[in-house]
Amino acid sequence: MKLSNMTAFLSLLIFILLVAIEARNLVGVERVELPNPASMVTAYWQKMLPHSPMPTAILELLNPPTDVNQGVHGNGYDQVYGNGYDGGYINGYSHSYSNGYSNGYFHKANLHFLEDALKPGSIITPYITGIATRAPFLRRDIADSIPVSTKNFADILAMFSPISLVMADGIQSALDTCEHHRPIKGEERACATSIESVVEFAMSVLGTRDLRAFSPDVPPEGIMPGNMYKVVAVRTVAGLRGDTVTCHTMRFPFAVFYCHAINPTRVYAVVLESEEDGSGSGSGTPEKMEALAVCHLDTSRFDPKTPLFVEHNLRPGDASVCHFVSRDSVIWAPVAAVITHGDEQVSIAE
């Protein structure tokens, strides 16, 4: 481990220990159990979104693996998937979305590509981040009673104790992002702590209750740059109106989504086939997968130092910027904007 990383780790450890001592002295803070009201979430979804099958990103939170809750308390799961490859839009969000795209997320090399790359036969090296966590939903009344604020950090540690260091780091970063996010002009965003608040935000931004939700069929651990894939097929999922909302899970003891919209956008379902020898079962590199690519069409307010712009000698506004989304992401689009192909809707991970 590098000295700088070791110093940062020790600083975090000392900070967590101090907060833990403070949390022990808190009066009136009750420990929160992690109920998983799957039937309530399902009933709400069917009532509010009768035209949208539940996407995998939501389904997998209804019946999370048993080691997820253990991971919250330090038994591995968040160690495997929670680091998000050290700095994508999983590891803290405060390094990713919170600074108007001036660094972090939009400065990750290989993360972005031009829309022209999405042509059958093209060879690309996709960068798809791993999932943040698979923490269960809380009932809305319980979730709403927990202020998403940095000053509430010690309370949250006490409510969900014991908490692993990785999870504590995720909580701190999520709270900081939700409280101090600095969006680019025109961006709409929210931290949603229940299924109801996720759906309500999407409906509010898109101006309709008639929505469809999509998630990609990609590995939970993501795909690191360097693995070559051929673009086998491309289908436009949403783009008739150009407005979508994207929600990503954040590392937290219960399901918390970072939802935002930087419109106009186009969304593509992209079938990718590995060009690597030995890919497939047991290799960690899937032979074939169906990903979701989001293309931001108006990049005039993006940072000119975005690696994609620098690499292609482009200025903000010269071209659209595309990126793939992780397995735990949900993309929302008005039903009227969803592209149909023949008599069938696209089937990607609904």
Curated annotation (Swiss-Prot):
Domain BURP: 112-335
Keywords: Signal
InterPro entries, alphabetized: BURP, BURP_dom
Superkingdom of origin: Eukaryota
Pfam families in the record: BURP
Keyword flag Signal: yes
Range of residues in the leader sequence: 1-23
Tissue/organ expression: Expressed in roots and panicles.
Protein name: BURP domain-containing protein 10
Top-level taxonomy: Eukaryota, Viridiplantae, Streptophyta, Embryophyta, Tracheophyta
